[in-house]
């Protein structure tokens, strides 16, 4: 547990130590991709707000602990879930959401097309919430959102995701 008074006596703002901030990437195929950039001491991870709140990477003490695929970071594309082209939008990351309708490769079953690893992985979050605050002597960082995979006369699947970190 962090001693709040001692910590605040030596730093001007808690963002020096830990926090979350919404950012937008601005170049290449990632242009326009929004993220909740979390830093917590030696830990850094951006949650991709436009890609199901998946963390694009996790770095600990500057060392990357995750995969970034050849296509690299990128925003939503017209081919994100279209047939074999879908593999061009898989950027990897520290966690990669599969599903919710399917988790296998691209195939057609009973006339229904299922894209590689499902549609949820490229679904932007709604009802996004970000906060960082002291509570009972602990500095907490929270990010949450809701993603929906739905069609008018079909499925209506909702994924609610919350990431919670405590600075120690």
Each model region followed by its residue ranges:
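Surface-exposed acidic/polar loop and edge beta-strand patches at domain peripheries
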Residues: 1-164
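Conserved small/polar residues in nucleotide/adenosyl-binding loops
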Residues: 166-168
């Amino acid at each position: 547990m962090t001693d709040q008074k001692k910590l605040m006596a030596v730093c001007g703002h808690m963002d020096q130590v830990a926090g979350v901030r919404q950012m937008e990437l601005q170049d290449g195929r990632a242009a326009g991709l929004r993220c909740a950039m979390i830093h917590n001491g030696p830990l850094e991870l951006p949650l991709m707000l436009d890609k199901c709140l998946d963390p694009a990477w996790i770095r600990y003490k500057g060392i990357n602990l995750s995969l970034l695929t050849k296509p690299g970071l990128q925003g939503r594309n017209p081919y994100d879930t279209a047939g074999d082209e879908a593999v061009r939008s898989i950027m990897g990351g520290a966690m990669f959401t599969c599903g919710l309708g399917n988790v296998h490769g691209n195939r057609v079953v009973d006339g229904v097309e299922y894209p590689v690893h499902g549609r949820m992985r490229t679904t932007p979050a709604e009802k996004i919430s970000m906060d960082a605050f002291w509570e009972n002597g602990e500095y907490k960082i929270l990010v949450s959102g809701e993603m929906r995979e739905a069609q008018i006369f079909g499925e209506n699947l909702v994924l609610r995701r919350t990431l919670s970190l405590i600075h120690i």
